[in-house]
Protein backbone atom coordinates (compact mmCIF):
# COMPACT_ATOMS: atom_id res chain seq x y z
CA UNK A 1 0.00 0.00 0.00
CA UNK A 2 1.45 3.33 -1.08
CA UNK A 3 0.92 6.57 0.78
CA UNK A 4 0.95 10.03 -0.74
CA UNK A 5 1.04 13.61 0.47
CA UNK A 6 -2.10 15.48 -0.55
CA UNK A 7 -1.98 19.27 -0.25
CA UNK A 8 -5.48 20.71 0.18
CA UNK A 9 -5.91 24.41 -0.55
CA UNK A 10 -9.07 25.57 1.22
CA UNK A 11 -10.55 29.05 1.70
CA UNK A 12 -8.98 28.92 5.19
CA UNK A 13 -5.46 28.11 3.99
CA UNK A 14 -3.31 25.14 3.02
CA UNK A 15 -3.10 21.77 4.74
CA UNK A 16 -1.04 18.73 3.80
CA UNK A 17 -2.30 15.29 4.76
CA UNK A 18 -1.04 11.77 4.26
CA UNK A 19 -3.43 9.58 2.29
CA UNK A 20 -2.95 5.94 1.33
CA UNK A 21 -3.82 4.81 -2.18
CA UNK A 22 -6.84 2.88 -0.87
CA UNK A 23 -8.37 5.75 1.14
CA UNK A 24 -10.63 8.40 -0.33
CA UNK A 25 -9.15 11.89 0.00
CA UNK A 26 -12.27 13.20 1.79
CA UNK A 27 -12.01 10.43 4.41
CA UNK A 28 -8.31 11.11 5.00
CA UNK A 29 -9.00 14.84 5.34
CA UNK A 30 -11.69 14.19 7.93
CA UNK A 31 -9.38 11.85 9.85
CA UNK A 32 -6.85 14.72 9.89
CA UNK A 33 -9.47 17.01 11.41
CA UNK A 34 -10.30 19.02 8.30
CA UNK A 35 -13.87 20.07 7.56
CA UNK A 36 -14.44 19.78 3.81
CA UNK A 37 -17.81 20.03 2.03
CA UNK A 38 -19.63 16.82 1.11
CA UNK A 39 -23.14 15.47 0.66
CA UNK A 40 -23.71 12.09 -1.00
CA UNK A 41 -20.27 10.49 -0.35
CA UNK A 42 -20.92 8.35 -3.45
CA UNK A 43 -19.56 10.43 -6.34
CA UNK A 44 -23.05 11.26 -7.56
CA UNK A 45 -23.23 15.00 -6.76
CA UNK A 46 -20.81 17.94 -6.84
CA UNK A 47 -20.75 19.17 -3.23
CA UNK A 48 -17.21 17.88 -2.58
CA UNK A 49 -15.75 19.03 -5.90
CA UNK A 50 -12.18 20.25 -6.01
CA UNK A 51 -9.68 21.06 -8.73
CA UNK A 52 -6.41 19.18 -8.98
CA UNK A 53 -3.49 21.44 -9.83
CA UNK A 54 -0.64 18.92 -9.47
CA UNK A 55 -0.38 15.14 -9.35
CA UNK A 56 -3.06 12.58 -10.13
CA UNK A 57 -6.01 10.72 -8.62
CA UNK A 58 -8.19 7.71 -9.43
CA UNK A 59 -11.82 8.77 -9.31
CA UNK A 60 -13.24 5.94 -11.42
CA UNK A 61 -16.05 5.45 -8.87
CA UNK A 62 -17.55 8.87 -9.67
CA UNK A 63 -20.65 9.21 -11.86
CA UNK A 64 -21.29 12.98 -11.86
CA UNK A 65 -18.47 14.77 -13.70
CA UNK A 66 -18.43 14.74 -17.49
CA UNK A 67 -15.28 14.15 -19.55
CA UNK A 68 -14.69 17.88 -20.10
CA UNK A 69 -14.83 18.57 -16.36
CA UNK A 70 -12.42 15.71 -15.63
CA UNK A 71 -10.03 16.94 -18.35
CA UNK A 72 -10.21 20.42 -16.79
CA UNK A 73 -8.95 18.90 -13.52
CA UNK A 74 -12.11 18.67 -11.45
CA UNK A 75 -12.21 15.90 -8.88
CA UNK A 76 -14.80 14.57 -6.44
CA UNK A 77 -12.86 14.16 -3.19
CA UNK A 78 -15.37 11.68 -1.73
CA UNK A 79 -14.45 9.03 -4.34
CA UNK A 80 -10.89 10.05 -5.27
CA UNK A 81 -7.87 7.94 -4.37
CA UNK A 82 -4.45 9.59 -4.74
CA UNK A 83 -2.16 7.93 -7.30
CA UNK A 84 0.73 10.34 -6.64
CA UNK A 85 1.52 13.28 -4.38
CA UNK A 86 -1.03 15.88 -5.40
CA UNK A 87 -2.43 19.35 -4.79
CA UNK A 88 -6.18 19.99 -4.78
CA UNK A 89 -8.06 23.27 -4.46
CA UNK A 90 -11.23 22.47 -2.50
CA UNK A 91 -14.65 24.18 -2.41
CA UNK A 92 -14.95 24.30 -6.24
CA UNK A 93 -18.60 23.25 -6.66
CA UNK A 94 -19.66 26.71 -7.87
CA UNK A 95 -16.99 26.65 -10.60
CA UNK A 96 -18.64 23.64 -12.26
CA UNK A 97 -21.72 25.64 -13.30
From Swiss-Prot:
Binding positions for [2Fe-2S] cluster per the UniProt entry: 40, 45, 48, 78
Domain 2Fe-2S ferredoxin-type: 4-94
Protein's job: Ferredoxins are iron-sulfur proteins that transfer electrons in a wide variety of metabolic reactions.
Record family assignment: Belongs to the 2Fe2S plant-type ferredoxin family.
Gene3D superfamilies noted in UniProt: 3.10.20.30
GO terms of molecular function: 2 iron, 2 sulfur cluster binding; electron transfer activity; metal ion binding
Disulfide bonds: none
Protein name according to UniProt: Ferredoxin
A Pfam family this chain is assigned to: Fer2
Record bears the keyword Electron transport: yes
SUPFAM superfamilies the UniProt entry points to: 2Fe-2S ferredoxin-like (SSF54292)
Amino acid sequence: MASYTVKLITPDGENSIECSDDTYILDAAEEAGLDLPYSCRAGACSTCAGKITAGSVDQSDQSFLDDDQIEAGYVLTCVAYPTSDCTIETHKEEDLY
